[in-house]
Each structure stands twice: as C-alpha cells, then as structure tokens.
Amino acid sequence: MDKKFYITTLGCPKNIADSMSMHHSLLEEGFTPASLPEESDFHFINTCTFIQSATEETIQTILSAAQVKKQNHQKLVVVGCFAERYPDNIHSEIPEVDLFFGTGKYSQAGKILREKFPELSPSQLEFNDSLLERWKLSSKIENYSKPYAYVKVSDGCNRGCSFCIIPSFRGKFAESPLDDILRDTNRAIRAGAKEICLVSQDTVYYGRDSEILLDMVRKVAEIDSLEILRLLYLYPDKKTEKLIRLMGETSKIAPYLESPLQHVSSKILKVMNRTGESSYFKDLFSLAREVKPGLEIRTSFIIGYPGEEPEDVDQILRFIEDTRPEKVNLFSYSPQEGTKGAQLKQTVSEKEKSKRINLIRDSHLEILEEIHESRIGRTYDAIVDGIEDGQAVVRRFQDAPEMDEVVYVDDVSLLPGRIGKVRIDSFYEYDMNGTWV
C-alpha cells in the first residue's frame, strides 16, 4: 500500500520553494501526493515565524492539524522556521507532532521520513515508476496546475537588520550553485510553468559580486522555453541599480520591481541597521520606470519601530505621494525575541501602530484609485492563472503571483498558462475586471 503525503505551506514564496523541494524528495523515496490533508498518511506543515502574527497562525494551523490527525490516524510532521526556532516547545507542548525538523533539510524529507519510520522501508512503499518519472520533471512549485514556479537562488542573510529574526534560524547567506538554479528552472518549465520567480532572503547578494549576479539572471533568461522571469526581494542598493538596467535590456524580465524599503526616515533606517535614504530610494524607483516602460513597483514598510515619531510617518506619506508605488505592503512592528530591536524600548503602542498603518493605507488607496482610473481601457500583457467561481483569473505581467492584483475575465475557455492581452474595464479596491483581447 503506497503512503501519501500532503504539505501545508505557510508564509512567503520562499517557503513554497522549500515545500516543493520536500515534495520532490518525498516522491523520490516512493511516497505519493494526496489531494487533501485528511487523505494523507503524513501531513507536513511548513511553518513561518517571521512576525508574531505568522507565529500565531503557525501554532493554530498545527493545533487544527492535530485534530485532523486524531480522526484519520495520520502522522503530523512540522518543519521549517518554527521548528528551527522552537524545537523544545514543540517537543514539550505539542505531543501530537510525530516528527519535526528545521530549515536546511527540505531536500532530505523523504529520507528523514524513512529513517524515522523504518517500518516503511522499503517494502511498505510502492515505487510507481511512471508517477516518479513524471514528477521528476517538476521543480519547486506549490501547485503544478499553476503556470508559475518559485526557484530559490539562496538561503539565509548577512544583512543583520535589527528587526529580523531570520538569520538566527536560516543562517548566513548561502547561495545555490548556478547549475542547480538552471536545473530547477528547467524542471519547472517542463512541468508546465511559463513564469519563473527567483526568490531568496536577499536576491541581490547572490555571488557577492554584481557581475556574478547579472550572469546568473542572464543565463536563466536565456532558457528558450521560459516566457516570463520575475525577480523578487531586491534590497535597495547599487546592485539593484544594475539589475534594473538589465531589466531594461531583457524583454523576458517582467516589468516589476519588488524592493522592500521598510522605512524612509534616515533616523529609523539607522536604528534598523539598514542602508539608504529617501532621496536614493526615489532615484532608484525613477530609474526603474525610466529603463522599463510600464514597470510597476511593490515595496513594504514596517510601522511602529522603536523611536518612530509622527514626523517619521509623515516622511513615508510624502514618499508615497512623490513616488506613487502601485503596491504597498504595511507591517506593524512586533519585537522578535533574539533581535536587537527587541532590546530597544518599545515606544509605540499597538493602538498607535494601527492608527499609523490606517493613515498610510488610506493615503495610498487614494493614489491607487487614481492609478486604477488610468488603467481603464488600457491593454496589458497577461497570463491566465486559472478559473475561479466561473471566471478566468488573469494576471498582468506587472503583478506577481499570489500577492498582487488580478484581473477577472468572463471567459472560462481560457486555459491556465495562456499568454495574451487583457483590457482593463473596471476595478475594485485592488483587483480589476477586464476583457481578453
């Protein structure tokens, strides 16, 4: 009897890539994917603990899965950042968890499972060669019916931002060999992906030299059957400038800049142990729009960091008004144990953080409404992601999968992965309605 697994993925696209590394490992060891958690013999939860709300979601997901386990007599496996950060807590407080391991072992998941449960090895597993060979063509994609894939170029981070806990459990920056990146990209494309998103904690740190970074991106873009290449997590510095210029020279690279600024106040950036300042960020955004016509920008800000004053929030408001980024993500600062930020006096109340976030969000929504108005009647290059509630879910090249806007089109004949043009007809607060043309 073959043993089935299911992977629940929490957190960011980097976790999706890690989950698919596990997926591939489990297939190689003879396990079969299940369609639903309750149908699996082994339910993996790939966890997130980047901020407090992510930790709370992880705990709730584990506890809910523990209830399913009791009803279905399955094994519960907790992996990733939460398991790396809180192994003692899992061991002592969540006895329903049968196995847990941290980051860095995703590609060994199948072997770890067989070692933990020796009764599975090897006679209890049915090695379905045709299934295995088909899935060996796959890469790190969360759902193989989707026309996009995430490929990790590195893990860990050397930046040392004072608010970030990630280096404590992901470790120092460690890049993937170029051959591995190309292999994973080709596997994903053969599995049906039209779009590849390169992800990491710090993409521009790759190679520690801008020419090595640019060479890696060029070689991925040169893969013949790749339609769209999207670059994610670009730290705002000089190497990002060079990447932006490469975007302008390379048609396959999506017209999209994701660069998380986290703040624009020089005072707060210094306390965060981050480089840059408002005028440099403005120049960076202007350069991107200049060299890549039609490009749209996604950035993020952490609100309520220790020492933040109303005038620092005003700087963010002015920056957004001046640069008009199309996509803005706002995080309420939550001190993470083990970071330098947690050692600072917490000067902003939760109520005040919410007030400031709402102020910034409302201001950006006014700008976004004007941006939406300018999109009406315009036609964009787009890709079909799937069908949902009787409509095609279409995504402009200016929007990243799973985190940006989509366009709903009344045409269920559109197949996932189809690339063409969509005209924008109307909009909601974020998403849009359109016509495939």
Swiss-Prot record:
Please state the protein's primary subcellular location. Answer: cytoplasm
Q: Name one GO biological process term.
A: tRNA modification
Domain TRAM per the UniProt entry, residue ranges: 373-437
Summarize where [4Fe-4S] cluster 2 binds, as residue positions: C157, C161, C164
Which residue ranges does the record assign to the Radical SAM core domain?
A: 143-370
Against InterPro entries, the record matches this protein to: Elp3/MiaA/NifB-like_rSAM, Methylthiotransferase, Methylthiotransferase_CS, Methylthiotransferase_N, Methylthiotransferase_N_sf, NA-bd_OB-fold, Ribosomal_uS12_MeSTrfase_RimO, rSAM
Alphabetized UniProt keyword annotations: 4Fe-4S, Cytoplasm, Iron, Iron-sulfur, Metal-binding, S-adenosyl-L-methionine, Transferase
What class does this enzyme belong to in the EC scheme?
Answer: transferase
Protein name, UniProt field: Ribosomal protein uS12 methylthiotransferase RimO
Native organism: Leptospira interrogans serogroup Icterohaemorrhagiae serovar copenhageni (strain Fiocruz L1-130)
